[in-house]
């Protein structure tokens, strides 16, 4: 991997061996170019993870776009608001979450969690629920195993008064990965 990135590295930087990165890479070879591809021929034109911004995440939110089906990369849905992962799991288990919903889980961020616990249980439950058009938005975090339209690290978080704290049941939430947007529209008359 370092050999493929060579021209982007500081080749004169010392390594723990006492040699520079350039010296170490001089004899390195890429054995399988189908696996370690050159920058000129990437698997995808963009990285797997991107940052979204908008009125729901003025300081940003993270989504693993490489794990989101093409038909879900631009999605609008009705907010189903939960103040904990446990409440979200109960809602999924009771059948209260339906196609077209956006499950909004708040107060799971660094201060609200506290400690920003991983919201793995709800992402697994959602992945195995059979629901194909449901998204998840949280100020909590995900593991690398998360798949589907799961937007995490919404910042600022609910606990410190971030916009996610003001999302109400039934509000329209828009996730637009190609345009890097995460927005909410209040649906009160």
Question: Which residues does each PLM region occupy?
Answer:
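Catalytic or ion-coupling anion/metal-binding cores of large enzyme and transporter domains
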Residues: 1-189
């Amino acid at each position: 991997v370092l050999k493929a990135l060579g021209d982007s590295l500081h080749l004169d930087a010392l390594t723990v061996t006492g040699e520079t990165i350039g010296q170490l890479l001089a004899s390195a070879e890429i054995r399988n170019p189908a696996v370690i591809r050159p920058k000129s021929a990437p698997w995808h034109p963009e990285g797997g993870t991107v940052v979204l911004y908008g009125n729901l995440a003025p300081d940003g939110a993270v989504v693993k776009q490489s794990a989101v089906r093409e038909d879900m990369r631009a999605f609008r849905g009705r907010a189903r608001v939960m103040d904990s992962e446990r409440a979200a799991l109960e809602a999924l288990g009771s059948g209260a979450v339906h196609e077209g919903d956006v499950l909004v889980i708040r107060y799971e961020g660094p201060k609200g969690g506290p400690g920003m616990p991983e919201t793995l249980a709800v992402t697994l439950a959602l992945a195995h629920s059979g629901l194909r058009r449901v998204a998840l938005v949280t100020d909590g975090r995900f593991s690398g195993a998360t798949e589907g339209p799961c937007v995490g690290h919404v910042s600022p978080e609910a606990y410190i008064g971030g916009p996610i704290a003001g999302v109400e049941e039934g509000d329209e939430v828009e996730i637009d990965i190609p345009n890097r947007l995460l927005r909410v529209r209040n649906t009160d008359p």
